[in-house]
């Protein structure tokens, strides 16, 4: 029987964010399932939109004998601590070593992890696994669409396969694709030639959305280029908030011959470069966006949905800035709701006050973001919740969410979801679990960039993007870069990065 070791370790690192990812964050998971290990992994990772879940489903259909090590992820943030990285990687590597003899290894990774002691978290992990399994055993990994792929990652994996949708509704499908490629490697007992290309400009995350052009057509062309000669081809637009040499978009292809791989990769690079002008769109200030939403809402029959993109916890934001809340209240928005503000202290105070009570709070604004501060006002506690529910929309895809003590607060006709844990508001259930019906609102403000669109676009009359203070600037050129590779453009057609000096890793 074919014997495959597997594991999952996912983190998207914004090196400019205020909060690091500790081991406890991986234990809880944030928007990811809670940490599981050994035989508990397949029990936990079923019937959900996750790479590991899709791989397990496909592997069981092949009747492979699976040897799980550990599965965990944490909300995007600043660097993964050395303690967390070493503890989790040791479980993976030791588990793989003790599972031998093996026929192959699969890892579900993000591809944009930076740690306190390594710029390239996934490259380091893959190198350690390769050292244990040797050069002959196939090693395949699935990656996030936002992966900052490095030469080290490409070197040590036999195949890297990235998501093709943003919102990421194909995470499980990517795991299935990884299983198919691993099966092909096992059947043919041959390695494919690799081609790896890095693009010359950073792509803002809002314009990486595959529901829109130019990404939509790029991924359609990418799928059409796959064949028996090129069994897998990926384009990762990257995560433009990790200050290290290999931050940015990349293309990676696997072909029967080097010529096949090179031709496929170069075709996608040329297509992306031809659309450099198109990775751009309208971004509103908080007041401008709220006023425009209020005007649209006068005639709309469905909610106007605003992305509070710069405080997106799915991109390293702390999900606690108050700029959009202030704009809603200042402009006297009606039938408006905002979520999720991460503030355990305020959630605790709301629970202590009780449903129906009025409570004075210093809400949010505790992460030290420049231009932001706690919002000190009196709120009505409309509802409270323990924070456990299932997110049923296309992005989370059935994940059990654990937001901790939570509440629906009201000020004027603006309602706010406050929670004790942070997760990107990408599911309608993240309003409903505290008693707010999203379809009944005129305006919704979601702390998200793109993932919310999977569940909210069907109920929205219009989508807007606003830039209130936050850790993930919509324009990557506004970040204080010091360690990128020389010459890379900081936005499409933007200024080129010129390093003052070679800076050391900063954790």
PLM regions and their residue ranges:
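Glycine-rich phosphate/diphosphate-binding loops that line cofactor/substrate pockets in enzymes
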Residues: 1, 60-68, 94-103, 290-304, ...
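Internal, active-site/partner-interface "lid" segment
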Residues: 186-216
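Extended hydrophobic packing segments that form well-structured cores
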Residues: 68, 273, 390-507
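Active-site histidine-anchored catalytic micro-motif
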Residues: 5-12, 17, 26-27, 76-78, ...
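N-terminal amphipathic/basic leader segments beginning at the initiator methionine
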Residues: 1-58
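Hard-cation-handling environments
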Residues: 2, 206-413, 417-421
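Structural motif
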Residues: 3-5, 65-67, 103-105, 137-141, ...
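Low-complexity, highly charged intrinsically disordered N-terminal segments
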Residues: 56-84, 88-96
């Amino acid at each position: 029987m074919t014997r495959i070791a597997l594991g999952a370790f996912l983190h998207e690192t914004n090196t400019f964010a205020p909060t690091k990812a500790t081991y406890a964050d991986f234990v809880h998971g944030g928007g990811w399932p809670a940490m599981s290990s050994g035989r508990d992994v397949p029990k936990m990772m079923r019937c959900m939109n996750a790479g590991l879940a899709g791989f397990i489903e496909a592997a069981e259909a092949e009747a492979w004998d699976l040897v799980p090590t550990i599965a965990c992820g944490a909300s995007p943030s600043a660097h993964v601590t050395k303690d967390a990285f070493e503890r989790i990687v040791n479980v993976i590597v030791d588990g793989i070593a003790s599972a031998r003899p093996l026929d192959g290894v699969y890892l579900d990774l993000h591809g944009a992890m930076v740690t306190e002691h390594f710029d390239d978290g996934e490259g380091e992990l893959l190198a350690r696994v390769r050292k244990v399994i040797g050069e002959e055993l196939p090693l395949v990994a699935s990656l996030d669409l936002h992966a900052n792929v490095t030469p080290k990652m490409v070197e040590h994996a036999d195949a890297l396969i990235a998501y093709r949708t943003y919102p990421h509704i194909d995470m499980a499908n990517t795991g299935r694709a990884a299983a198919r490629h691993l099966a092909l490697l096992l059947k043919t007992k041959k390695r494919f030639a690799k081609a790896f290309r890095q693009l010359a400009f950073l792509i803002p995350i809002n314009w990486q959305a595959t529901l829109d052009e130019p990404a939509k057509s790029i991924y359609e062309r990418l799928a059409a280029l796959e064949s028996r000669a090129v069994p897998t081809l990926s384009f990762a637009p990257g995560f433009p908030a990790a200050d290290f040499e290999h931050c940015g978009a990349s293309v990676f292809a696997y072909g029967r011959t080097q010529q096949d791989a090179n031709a496929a990769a170069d075709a996608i690079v040329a297509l992306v470069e031809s659309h450099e002008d198109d990775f751009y769109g309208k971004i509103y200030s908080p007041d401008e966006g709220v006023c425009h939403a209020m005007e649209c809402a006068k005639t709309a029959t469905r909610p106007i949905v605003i992305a509070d993109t710069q405080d997106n916890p799915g991109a390293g934001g702390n999900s606690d800035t108050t700029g959009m809340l202030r704009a809603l209240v200042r402009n006297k928005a009606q039938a408006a709701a905002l979520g999720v503000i991460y503030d355990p202290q305020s959630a605790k105070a709301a629970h202590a006050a009780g449903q129906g009570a009025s409570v004075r709070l210093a809400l949010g604004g505790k992460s030290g973001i420049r231009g932001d501060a706690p919002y000190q006002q009196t709120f009505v506690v409309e509802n409270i919740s323990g924070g456990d529910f299932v997110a049923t929309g296309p992005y989370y895809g059935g994940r059990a969410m654990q937001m901790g003590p939570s509440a629906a607060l009201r000020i004027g006709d603006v309602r706010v979801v406050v929670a004790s844990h942070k997760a990107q508001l990408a599911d309608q259930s993240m309003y409903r679990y505290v008693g707010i019906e999203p379809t009944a609102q005129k305006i919704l403000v979601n702390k998200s960039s793109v993932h919310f669109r999977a569940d909210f676009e069907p109920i929205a009359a219009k989508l807007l993007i606003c830039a209130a203070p936050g850790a993930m600037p919509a324009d990557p050129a506004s970040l204080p870069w010091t360690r990128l590779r020389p010459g890379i453009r900081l936005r499409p057609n933007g200024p080129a990065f010129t390093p003052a000096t070679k800076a050391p890793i900063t954790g």
